[in-house]
Amino acid sequence: MEGGWPARQSALLCLTVSLLLQGRGDAFTINCSGFDQHGVDPAVFQAVFDRKAFRPFTNYSIPTRVNISFTLSAILGVDAQLQLLTSFLWMDLVWDNPFINWNPKECVGINKLTVLAENLWLPDIFIVESMDVDQTPSGLTAYISSEGRIKYDKPMRVTSICNLDIFYFPFDQQNCTFTFSSFLYTVDSMLLGMDKEVWEITDTSRKVIQTQGEWELLGINKATPKMSMGNNLYDQIMFYVAIRRRPSLYIINLLVPSSFLVAIDALSFYLPAESENRAPFKITLLLGYNVFLLMMNDLLPASGTPLISVYFALCLSLMVVSLLETVFITYLLHVATTQPPPMPRWLHSLLLHCTSPGRCCPTAPQKGNKGLGLTLTHLPGPKEPGELAGKKLGPRETEPDGGSGWTKTQLMELWVQFSHAMDTLLFRLYLLFMASSILTVIVLWNT
């Protein structure tokens, strides 16, 4: 009795090796006596069921060919922070079992049966990128044809790793891969093929996909690489799945409000520079824009730096620069109306040059100084820009930086005119920078 258990182990091992290494396998005869109009006696396939632990072959040197296809029925979510794609698909496997064969004419016309998949040998096909445990439900069935062809459909919820690039968010396209491979069988034992053409897989997936949410399917391509691990070579089929984000939600909730606020900020330059409402108005816009960014933060990706974040930072910077320009002009007007300093000669000459008719420099707006009740036509001293340009100034009038011929009122008028010219110049520079920046972002989004 002491040597009984090792002897049984040796016998079992010899039986297994003989089944695997034999040059020809035994062919099982399907007895049609078990077929009738009410079904099939399971005992008819019992010999096949008993060998479900072994790959079915009649010649060990010939690998089993497994044809693969799948249908992508839902894109459940994309996690940019974890770089994961969650999808639902049906995986279809087709292979031949040489031990299953019957004549439908002799078997009451039955040419196809459904059998519990757990009673058959199943290829160990898995998705390489999958980051989750296989949760295939139990009790699935497989179709068996009279020629021994087996078709096995398997529903799968796949959480797969995907290299996500969110730089072009929300106009981004992602390319994820599903790589089907065998975990155990090398190319000597199993080869993978296509059950359907790629265009058929794409068309079927587009028709049956049930999610009309954030992502849409663009197309599917394939490649057939080989994976080498040590001395073993495994066959693979790699599918490239291209998906695109639907940007409507983000355009309506992010881009349109942001563009409106920036446009209103630009239009606020048309408020009179002497008005006390321009600076508070711009401050209110700036605070409102910050509140808008805080409220919409949940719609932005949690990782990376998408181009839309650069766009928001650019808009915020433009509003800050606009406010600083208003502060600068307000300061110039304050100095001009309280204690105007002597104007340097070069600045006075530049002002005369720029305000002369036909010049390309920005002309100072002919706005009244509402705070003083003065206008350029009512202030004594210097003439209008046109008159100043056409008149040869006397020796005393050509020295605004120290000559005694210039009164405080005349200096005030010059500094107010200079402030208006600077306001116009800075406004044009602001518009130029804003237009070029926004066009650059749009071009980057379209590349």
Swiss-Prot record:
InterPro entries (alphabetical): LGIC_TM_5-HT3, Neur_chan_lig-bd, Neur_chan_lig-bd_sf, Neur_channel, Neuro-gated_channel_TM_sf, Neuro_actylchol_rec, Neurotrans-gated_channel_TM, Neurotransmitter_ion_chnl_CS
Gene3D superfamilies for the chain: Neurotransmitter-gated ion-channel ligand-binding domain (2.70.170.10), Neurotransmitter-gated ion-channel transmembrane domain (1.20.58.390)
GO biological process: chemical synaptic transmission; inorganic cation transmembrane transport; monoatomic ion transmembrane transport; regulation of membrane potential; serotonin receptor signaling pathway; serotonin-gated cation-selective signaling pathway
Comp. bias intervals (Basic and acidic residues): 384-399
SUPFAM superfamilies membership: Neurotransmitter-gated ion-channel transmembrane pore, Nicotinic receptor ligand binding domain-like
Pfam family, one: Neur_chan_LBD
Entry comment describing in which tissues the protein is expressed: Expressed in many tissues including adult brain, colon, intestine, lung, muscle and stomach as well as fetal colon and kidney.
UniProt KW keywords: Cell membrane, Disulfide bond, Ion channel, Ion transport, Ligand-gated ion channel, Membrane, Postsynaptic cell membrane, Receptor, Signal, Synapse, Transmembrane, Transmembrane helix, Transport
Disulfide partners: C162-C176
Keyword Endoplasmic reticulum assigned: no
Cytoplasmic side: 270-282, 330-424
Molecular function per GO: excitatory extracellular ligand-gated monoatomic ion channel activity; serotonin-gated monoatomic cation channel activity; transmitter-gated monoatomic ion channel activity involved in regulation of postsynaptic membrane potential
Region (HA-stretch): 401-423
Topological relation to the membrane, as annotated: Multi-pass membrane protein
Oligomeric and partner information: Forms homopentameric as well as heteropentameric serotonin-activated cation-selective channel complexes with HTR3A. The homomeric complex is not functional. Heteropentameric complexes display properties which resemble that of neuronal serotonin-activated channels in vivo.
Assigned protein family: Belongs to the ligand-gated ion channel (TC 1.A.9) family. 5-hydroxytryptamine receptor (TC 1.A.9.2) subfamily. HTR3C sub-subfamily.
PANTHER family given in the database record: NEUROTRANSMITTER GATED ION CHANNEL (PTHR18945)
Domain statement: The HA-stretch region of HTR3C seems to confer increased conductance to HTR3A/HTR3C heteropentamers compared to that of HTR3A homopentamers.
Official protein name in the record: 5-hydroxytryptamine receptor 3C
Organism: Homo sapiens (Human)
